[in-house]
Amino acid sequence: MSLSLWQQCLARLQDELPATEFSMWIRPLQAELSDNTLALYAPNRFVLDWVRDKYLNNINGLLNDFCGTDAPLLRFEVGSKPPQMAVLQPASQHASEAPSQAAVARPRPSRPSWDNAPVQPELSYRSNVNPKHNFDNFVEGKSNQLARAAARQVADNPGGAYNPLFLYGGTGLGKTHLLHAVGNGIMARKANAKVVYMHSERFVQDMVKALQNNAIEEFKRYYRSVDALLIDDIQFFANKERSQEEFFHTFNALLEGNQQIILTSDRYPKEINGVEDRLKSRFGWGLTVAIEPPELETRVAILMKKADENAIRLPGEVAFFIAKRLRSNVRELEGALNRVIANANFTGRAITIDFVREALRDLLALQEKLVTIDNIQKTVAEYYKIKVADLLSKRRSRSVARPRQMAMALSKELTNHSLPEIGDAFGGRDHTTVLHACRKIEQLREESHDIKEDFSNLIRTLSS
């Protein structure tokens, strides 16, 4: 056996796992094979625990496939694999200080000297990080699990894990919360860390002021000497050529210094119109992760946690009632709950389903008016450039069947209709056909980036 065994495992895992999962969890691992033991080295404890919990069976299964009864034992360690004696350099060259591999699409020059970074007293940094947003009060679900995990790793290992980290998704899904959580995590680790959070428009405004005041060099020095730069809604750089030019050079300078960059957007990097290709390319150098609208269970958990923070008893059936009717984003959910709580405080009434119907009657009526099966069918047909009649027909070609399955899945997600009712609306189909369509789309969202994007785009369109 040789180290090529791990290369074979990597090749199979890359084929079997979604690209984001492979880049985030498997690619960072280093392997050492000796004495019939395969040691896998993870960059930190968080990655080690995750890989051991989620992928141990996959890896052991591959080792058995490739080696049979001669399969090596598997061992996990935190850190980098020991240097091989044959390639050791003299101590003066510090060969043993070589960095561990980072899970990025582009190699990093060197590990950051984070703990020894000099502080420049002549510059005053304002972090703008909201201390209320942290990882503990971020409700995790299937829709945001990878994004939270990636953000947590960046907070634990800024400049070394995923750089840049690019989070994208619709409005009100938790991107900004994660930015602040990372900032708070970094500053908890190092109190004097220079962490700057801002909206992209603030960067533009600062650059314009610097140009007006002939202070562009100070502007450059400020932004290029931070330890972590967290920029929200990067899509607002669109068509601002001078701002893009300056950010391009700032981006390069930060990456070369292994200073952390985290960006958010409402869309996938390559879909941001009005932004230069060279910038969009750089956005994808590290790790790009989507945040999707929360599923029902996560929406319920968000409501229960928010109620608990406000010392309000929210019955479970009421939380489910609200969550099943308001699906677009977290901000809308929290706003609805705030209205319910305020009404309950003003009237002194108990929070029941009937009370919620009354308190949110205009919001619920608008939601039901906007999202109907008919509207979903029209939106999906327009998105895929087919006719609504095709969705209702018996045609089974993939160009029609896949959009039909998507429309059925969206109808289940966004309306309160039963499976038989949805089937009737799609040409009198059986409820088992609808169930199969929903399961198929759920599976494809895990396996196909395109289907995942289509689902998110359609949810965003229908919920706006």
From Swiss-Prot:
Entry keyword annotation includes Ribonucleoprotein: no
Cross-referenced PROSITE patterns: DNAA (PS01008)
Pfam family of the protein (one): DnaA_N
Chain positions covered by the region annotation Disordered: 91-118
Keyword annotations of the record: ATP-binding, Cytoplasm, DNA replication, DNA-binding, Lipid-binding, Nucleotide-binding
Biological process (GO), any one: DNA replication initiation
Superkingdom of the organism of origin: Bacteria
Region (Domain II): 82-127
Keyword Nucleotide-binding attributed: yes
Subcellular location: Cytoplasm
Subunit composition and interactions: Oligomerizes as a right-handed, spiral filament on DNA at oriC.
Name this protein carries in UniProt: Chromosomal replication initiator protein DnaA
Organism encoding this protein: Sodalis glossinidius (strain morsitans)
Organism placement in taxonomy: Bacteria, Pseudomonadati, Pseudomonadota, Gammaproteobacteria, Enterobacterales
